C-alpha cells in the first residue's frame, strides 16, 4: 500500500515539474516575440522617417522552430517594414522623388499647382481632350438642328401662287355627285389645291368643317375643294381614303402630302400648309360664326342610310329562307343514307 502511494506521489511531482517547464517555455517564447516586435517597430519607424537609409533586404532568422512557427502563422499580419525592406533602394528613391514633385500646397498655390499638373499631363490625355471638344460641338449642333422647327427643312411642294386680282369671296368649292375632281385640277399647272374627303353624317367631319371653311381666307392663293366620299367612292379608292375626314395637298393633279395629325384645328392646318409649301397664312384670320354655317355643315346631318337598310333586308330574307328550307334539308339527309346502303 505504501509503495502505491509513493508511486502516485512520484507521478504527480513529475507532472507538476513538466507543467512548470512548459509554462517557462511559453513565457520565454512570448518574451522573444515581444522583443522581436519591438525591434521591428523601431526599424519600421526609422525607415518611414528616413526611407533613403532603409537597410538592405536580409532573411529573418529565428532562434527556435517554435518562434518561427509563431511568427509565420497566418493569424499574425505581415509587417509593412519587412515588405519595404524587400523593395530595392533605386525604386524607393524614384518613388520618393515623384511624390515630392507631385505634392502641392492646396492652400497657398492651388491655382499654380493646377496649372503645373495640367502641364505635366501626358500628351495622350491632352489629345483625348482635344478630340472630345469637336465631338461635343457636333453633338450640340445636332441638338440645335433637332430643336429647330420644320420650317428649316426643304419644302416638299413648290406651289405657284394663283392670281387673286378681282376675287373678293374666298370660299371652299364643294363637288356634287355629277362633278369630277379632275375638272378642278389642272395637270399642266403648279398651283396647289387642298382637297377634303368628308361625309355629311360623320361627326369628325362636322367638327373639322368650321376650321376648313376658314382656310380660304387665311391662304387666298390656294384652291380649296371638298367632296363627299360616299358619293365619290372611286376617287376615295384611288387616293387611298379609308377613313374620313381625309385631307390631301395636290400640286396640279398630283397628290403630294397628306394631313395625318389628330389635332384638326385651324392652327394645325396652317402649320401643315406652311411646312409643306412655305406659304404663310394671312395674320388675324380666325374662326367665326359664319364659318359654322357654310359651305361645309358644322353639324352631322341625319338621314337614311340606304345601304344599311338594304343589308338588314337581305339578312332578314336569308334567315326566313333558311328556316323554310329546314324540313327539306332534314329529308335529304336520310335519303342519302339509304342510297349508300343500297
Curated annotation (Swiss-Prot):
CDD domains: PDI_a_ERp44_like. Gene3D superfamilies: Glutaredoxin. Residues 173-276 form the Thioredoxin domain. Residues 1-21 form the signal peptide. It is a single-pass type I membrane protein. Residues 120-145 have a biased composition (Basic and acidic residues). Glycans are attached at residues 169, 176, 188. Residues 323-342 are cytoplasmic. It comes from the Eukaryota. It is found in: Cell projection, Cilium membrane. One of its GO terms (cellular component) is cilium. Residues 120-156 are annotated as: Disordered. GO terms for biological process: cilium assembly; positive regulation of smoothened signaling pathway. Pfam families: Thioredoxin. Its main location: membrane. Residues 22-301 are extracellular. Acts as a positive regulator of ciliary hedgehog signaling. Required for cilia biogenesis. This is Thioredoxin domain-containing protein 15. It comes from Xenopus laevis. The lineage of its organism: Eukaryota, Metazoa, Chordata, Craniata, Vertebrata.
